[in-house]
A protein has these predicted regions:
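Active-site-proximal beta-alpha core segment in soluble small-molecule metabolic enzymes
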Residues: 1-163, 189, 193
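Active-site anion/phosphate-binding pocket segments in diverse small-molecule metabolic enzymes
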Residues: 71, 168-199
């Protein structure tokens, strides 16, 4: 979302990559010197075919954020690799604006639509290489741990997945009565969940 080319160039010099939430952000990053292959696009508003083709042809990856987007990806890029953004069924945010998971959120493919997803993937010969979930920027460790479990269950549904992107911000308390995310409280049970998944 950063519009400042100098900051984007600084990020590039640090070896960071871009998680773009619109085609405009992706194009802005390319204009600042990023390779398209360093950009992942997850967007509510799917771009026009020509703009999408241009960056995908140069290596940009796409997370389909709805069944309709997945169908379009399959039509435009049959037999390609694709990421999937799922709504894991729960979210965490200090306000409704920062809570981007759960029934009230329009972000991501609803996790219970997994059979519909598999049908589209199979029909277009797609290879799902990444699962992306994003619950918001809340501080509740219990929600984060549940989201990890749900996300790992989604990973189990696709044999070729090599990347799990657990999205969401870590809340920083700015006012005396606001909580800050306790990374230790979140991190330890998340690590245990990943270790159980690997065993």
């Amino acid at each position: 979302a950063c519009p400042n080319a100098n900051i984007l160039r600084l990020f590039k010099s640090m070896g960071l990559k871009i998680d773009a939430s619109s085609i405009y952000e992706a194009e802005r990053a390319v204009a600042a010197g990023f390779d398209a292959s360093d950009i992942s696009l997850s967007t509510q508003e799917f771009p026009t075919d020509d703009r999408l083709f241009s960056l995908v042809a140069k290596g940009m990856s796409v997370n389909a954020c709805s069944l309709n987007q997945l169908e379009r990806c399959g039509t435009l890029f049959p037999n390609a690799k694709v990421g999937l953004r799922f709504n894991p069924g729960l979210g965490s945010g200090g306000t409704q604006r920062t809570n981007v998971g759960g029934p009230a959120s329009s972000f991501g493919i609803w996790f219970e639509d997994i059979d519909k997803v598999k049908k589209i993937v199979l029909g277009h010969g797609l290879e799902v290489f990444r699962i992306h979930t994003h619950i918001g920027s809340g501080s509740d460790p219990e929600v984060w741990v549940k989201a990890v479990g749900l996300s790992l269950n989604l990973v189990r549904s696709f044999d070729a997945v090599t990347v799990l992107n657990l999205g969401g911000g870590y809340k920083v308390g700015r006012m005396p009565d606001e909580e800050t995310t306790d990374l230790q409280a979140i991190g330890a049970p998340m690590r245990e969940a990943f270790e159980r998944f690997q065993s």
